[in-house]
Design a protein with these regions (language model features):
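Structural detector for internal amphipathic alpha-helices that build alpha-solenoid repeat scaffolds
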Residues: 1-5, 26-37, 47, 57-71, ...
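A contiguous pocket-lining binding segment that forms or flanks enzyme active sites
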Residues: 110-116, 120-132
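Amphipathic alpha-helical scaffolding segments comprising HEAT/armadillo-like alpha-solenoid repeats
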Residues: 2-17, 36-50, 71-84, 103-117, ...
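Short inter-helical turns and helix N-cap capping residues of alpha-solenoid HEAT/ARM repeat scaffolds
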Residues: 21-22, 53-55, 86-87, 119-120, ...
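Extended, low-complexity, acidic/polar intrinsically disordered regions
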Residues: 144-189
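Short, amphipathic alpha-helical segments
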Residues: 88, 92, 106, 118-125, ...
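Short, low-complexity, intrinsically disordered N-terminal segments
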Residues: 16-28
């Protein structure tokens, strides 16, 4: 049996242990996934959040695992899942795991703005928190694309029905303006 096949079987067993309902197996699987998990485990882990198979404490442990992922290619996979309509129910949880993460999501600035304008209040709040914590630097095209999402939002809706969301969108617009100014300043230094 090849090394890849053994790894896949091990991950399958660990994912089964997460669903077992046995806390001892669950905790052992979490510890093992912290060491042996790879990009292929992210979607099944998020999928588990959609079910009622986890106790509240196990659910919290699983969310913590997602928040502490240290895989360099995790941001691409997480963003793919966030945009997947099958996971809308757990989107705020996944967004929260991003701003708790140590991974760099700066490349996805415009994606967060898009989610903020299209999502509900909670999505917007989570995206604002993420954007506030992005380190950059930001590519000019991402800032421009993000500004276009804001402009389209303002032009198409005029005003959101949720005043709280409108305040958050305004804060995002100010952050984008600051990011744009920071880029201009860096060009002249």
């Amino acid at each position: 049996m090849g090394k890849d096949t053994k790894q896949k079987l091990k991950i399958t067993r660990l994912l089964d242990d997460l669903k077992s309902g046995n806390d001892t197996k669950f905790n052992a699987a979490i510890k093992s996934l912290q060491v042996h998990g790879d990009i292929s485990t992210i979607e099944p882990l998020v999928g588990l959040l959609l079910t009622d198979q986890l106790s509240q404490s196990n659910r919290s442990v699983l969310i913590e695992l997602l928040s502490t992922l240290n895989l360099s290619d995790a941001p691409d996979e997480i963003m793919r899942i966030i945009k997947d309509e099958n996971y809308l129910k757990v989107r705020p949880i996944i967004l929260s795991s991003i701003w708790n993460s140590k991974l760099d999501y700066s490349y996805f600035l415009s994606d967060f703005v898009e989610i903020a304008v299209e999502g509900d209040y909670l999505d917007t709040l989570e995206c604002l928190t993420i954007i506030e914590n992005l380190e950059g630097p930001f590519e000019e095209r991402h800032i421009l694309e993000a500004q276009l999402f804001l402009r389209d939002f303002i032009e198409s809706t005029g005003k959101t029905k949720d005043d709280r969301k409108a305040v958050l969108i305004s804060e995002i617009a100010l952050l984008l303006k600051d990011f744009d100014l920071d880029d201009d300043i860096e060009m002249y230094e």
